[in-house]
């Protein structure tokens, strides 16, 4: 049963929306809970397919896991150390089980992963990091196997390239290593900071998260604790762009403006009126002209690659020409041909996309979601296009946006989920 969204083009999107917890923080935190010998409560976990898959995976490993508002985890009974292919194939994040398993139990194996089709994301950086902490890694029959006699050993690790995933793996595993670990050229994303906050809540000694040098003083064991997942900055940005391109006015609650500085600066440059408080952001585009902006994606605190597709849509319907340069992932313009089907004028040249004035606006069409963030831009495009748009393969959206049609409906979008 393939589900699709049917969207009728309409007016401005306006109102209030409550932002969910960040998938990209919730996932590493759920996997890191394998390190805890006592019960853990994690609040503000979004309801998403990848989260469900992770909970099922942890359950298979022997974790007692329940959801009742928060997610409650008891990893004291872990008795299985292999993350099997049938679960891993749908989700790359499963590699995050490896570090905690080998750090706490001296062994772990994870099937080589699946997930979105964006470029080459090798697990080499994860493997290399664990090897530097003293683990022995082998690749056998499609599985990455890690083992260590006794405890992992602290190490000074200089990352070959900035990687959020590998930073999480090394940081998590190092919490139970003997001695001190220093990670240089570490990723600085807010989700890394949130994972470190969780680790510290259960007794780890992590400092420097959010900078390019993270220090982890190993401890013998980790207990239990409580943590609330940080707000999703990408979901926030997606709703802000929806207001900008539709000429609307939206207030995002339960969010963190400080994590979105690069995005907010570009929205202001594009002509939006932005206001912020401690945990809210408002955008007003009523009677204002949208102007195209140039963007170059970069690791945090630069402009996030996960907002690139939404801003290509903004540029396509704005006045003037905007150039977007993608420096993080290859093959990340798969939404552009779909937008061209709706009448957009854009040219892809290598890792840049040049978005020109789309005279006469967009027209509804049948389009296909190709990856998580790109698919959100197609939904927004449908709401500002003339006529009806069908977005196919929306399982990509369900992997990363909680109840997106409900939230958009409340803002005035004419959207429904249909099964065919």
From Swiss-Prot:
Keyword annotations from UniProtKB, A to Z: Cell cycle, Cell division, Cell shape, Cell wall biogenesis/degradation, Cytoplasm, Peptidoglycan synthesis, Pyruvate, Transferase
HAMAP family, per the entry: MurA
Positions contributing to phosphoenolpyruvate binding: 23-24
Protein name: UDP-N-acetylglucosamine 1-carboxyvinyltransferase
Family the entry assigns: Belongs to the EPSP synthase family. MurA subfamily.
Species this chain originates from: Photobacterium profundum (strain SS9)
Catalysed conversion reaction: phosphoenolpyruvate + UDP-N-acetyl-alpha-D-glucosamine = UDP-N-acetyl-3-O-(1-carboxyvinyl)-alpha-D-glucosamine + phosphate
Pathway: Cell wall biogenesis; peptidoglycan biosynthesis
GO BP, one annotated term: cell division
GO molecular function ontology, one term from the record: UDP-N-acetylglucosamine 1-carboxyvinyltransferase activity
EC number: 2.5.1.7
One GO cellular component term: cytoplasm
Pfam families in the cross-refs: EPSP_synthase (PF00275)
InterPro entries noted in UniProt: Enolpyruvate_Tfrase_dom, Enolpyruvate_Tfrase_sf, MurA_subfamily, RNA3'P_cycl/enolpyr_Trfase_a/b, UDP_GlcNAc_COvinyl_MurA
Principal subcellular localization: cytoplasm
Gene behind the chain: murA
Subcellular location: Cytoplasm
Function: Cell wall formation. Adds enolpyruvyl to UDP-N-acetylglucosamine.
Active-site positions on this chain: 116
Binding site for UDP-N-acetyl-alpha-D-glucosamine: 92, 121-125, 161-164, 306, 328
Residue numbers carrying 2-(S-cysteinyl)pyruvic acid O-phosphothioketal: 116
